[in-house]
Amino acid sequence: LTARVIRFERQSIIMAVSSGLGRPEVEAELPRRDQLPNDNYRANATFKVFLKEVSEVPRRGPQLFVSRSNAGLVVYLFENEVPEIQEGSVRIVAVAREANPPSRSVGPRTKVAVDSIEREVDPVGACIGARGSRIQQVVNELRGEKIDVIRWSQDPGQYIANSLSPARVEMVRLVDPAGQHAHVLVPPDQLSLAIGREGQNVRLAARLTGWKIDIKNS
């Protein structure tokens, strides 16, 4: 959805959302928790938003709530930019997003796991595009948010290793497959990269894969 800023109410932003060709715009609320830290919300500015909720309000009718921080917005943006996703040859398997990090010293970041239905299609390359053209469109819309696109794998060890990109992993030990607990060995020079600033990289990798990940020096 494309939404336009029309006014400010307390900490929320009221936006006008296009409801289709020839139809009037409808109002939607963008709550504070769903805003992005790098957005500049000013009157008549337009943004891509994700429709998060429609609730019935007594005497007011349906109330729309939209989000800029929801992982669904990232999916929506990639679907718009990547023809292979639209055609079904590439699919988004999982998304882990930290749009509002707990500390200001850490920027927003998202990890996206992708897979291809057709063997000859490179799903990561399709999402990144020639010279990064496709992913750059998504990054621009999210005001510079860092996005890691990684290859999904049925092999949990390979999937965990991929999820820690851009760090280089030497070995993944699935110490408790039933409890989804893994130890990951990385070279000493890759340790800080694998963990990420204030633990952001490993935190997102854990959320993406569903595994508890302990990182150790090899």
Report residues per predicted region.
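RNA-contacting regions in translation and RNA-metabolism proteins
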Residues: L1-S218
